[in-house]
Amino acid sequence: MHCLKAVVKGKVQGVYFRDFTRTQAIRLGLCGYAQNLESGTDVEVIAEGDKDILLEFLKLLRSGPPHAEVQEVEVSWSSTNGNYGDFHIKY
């Protein structure tokens, strides 16, 4: 199992980006979380699952929901032991 950490930059706060992320993650069977960062413009996403599914998820993060304007996605990978039981939004 792999872990994807993505910091999504651009107009991604206040446009339902975290809700979109959660919906797509659940649809793909991924676990982890999405949270706004204190920068006021970035969202951090942690997702665990099979690498092929995580790559599909990453494509979705790069496009985002209709009102989002994703400018950049910083990505890092690691292995995981399944730290999360579901996918949720952190507040």
UniProtKB/Swiss-Prot annotation:
One of its GO terms (molecular function) is acylphosphatase activity. It catalyses: an acyl phosphate + H2O = a carboxylate + phosphate + H(+). Keywords: Hydrolase. Residues 3-91 form the Acylphosphatase-like domain. The keyword Cell membrane does not apply. InterPro entries: Acylphosphatase (IPR020456), Acylphosphatase-like_dom (IPR001792), Acylphosphatase-like_dom_sf (IPR036046), Acylphosphatase_CS (IPR017968). The active site is at R18, N36. Its EC number is 3.6.1.7. It is an enzyme of class 3 (hydrolase). It holds the Pfam family Acylphosphatase. NCBIfam families: PRK14450.1. Belongs to the acylphosphatase family. This is Acylphosphatase.
